[in-house]
């Protein structure tokens, strides 16, 4: 790829894009406050997760036909400013009383106003699309978020997903659903199903940065 084309894909948001030692993100935060009431920046990190279905079998948490080597679209990191989310959703059930927002390794399940979850998402969470799932069935459900070194195996010069087994599950970071939030109105559609904390994301990224697949990518800048 010609150098000029590679430069188009550089991360200009966290680099000195303005030429004065200031990143674009920092500039927006400090100089454009009059133009937004709240703002959040996403890293685009997609997690790889396993769970157990109703039969007790381990399954990859992914939509039918989704290539999980590209990451998971069911999980999404939540903004640190809870108002960005909770202005649109309300907690309808939680493991703890007076729950407001997830902390640490806690996960929240988001639904439409009528408590509906897409059947493909339901299957990805380990349930049959015909199951009638109650709040009590979902609360406390555990997932194992697997890091690169445990999820991928190297075959010749390529990294491919390894076989899902108990060893992979046990090696992952365990999280569980602690609350269910539904949309306050019928016009709000959840953009994701499971929301997790930025603190958890930062912890996961601190491991991934030194993983074998990332090291290989760093060596191959072409």
Give the residues covered by each predicted segment.
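Basic-flanked hydrophobic alpha-helices used for secretion and membrane insertion
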Residues: 1-222
